[in-house]
């Protein structure tokens, strides 16, 4: 009887099994492209690891571009409730919408800097890692360059003065009413 697999293909099959094993599987993360801006001045919003890693110990690694120092942050991957979307509508009505953001916020970053972000998640004996994605924080803007628009217009000053005078007259009338009421 002939062997089922030739001896030469066995090493190739073992290599393929090692590469495709669950412990070596990579997953993708994103920079929350569904948001108006996932980048803030001193922080970034990063999508959470996939749902099949719920309960695993995640380590978020942040590396500054052109630097070898890696800053890590650890947390437990939160459970998924249905399909995990980056921004999901929780309640909507009466002219407002309540949303829930499923993301991890990386804080204390340098403004206007490019970073490379990746996850390493350990769940049981399996370890999965994400591919490294580039993200940049927003540059800090000069305070004088921010337009205030209607900061102190003439109409606002007039309304404030009128309200102040009306409040003074109201308090004065209340005091006079108390004084005249106690004479009887």
Curated annotation (Swiss-Prot):
Residues 26-84 form a propeptide. Keywords: Cell membrane, Cleavage on pair of basic residues, Glycoprotein, Membrane, Signal, Transmembrane, Transmembrane helix. Its main location: membrane. Residues 1-25 form the signal peptide. Expressed in ureter. The chain crosses the membrane at residues 156-176. The keyword Signal applies. It is found in: Cell membrane. Residues 177-184 are cytoplasmic. InterPro entries: Uroplakin-2. Disulfide bonds: none annotated. Component of the asymmetric unit membrane (AUM); a highly specialized biomembrane elaborated by terminally differentiated urothelial cells. May play an important role in regulating the assembly of the AUM. This is Uroplakin-2. It comes from Homo sapiens (Human).
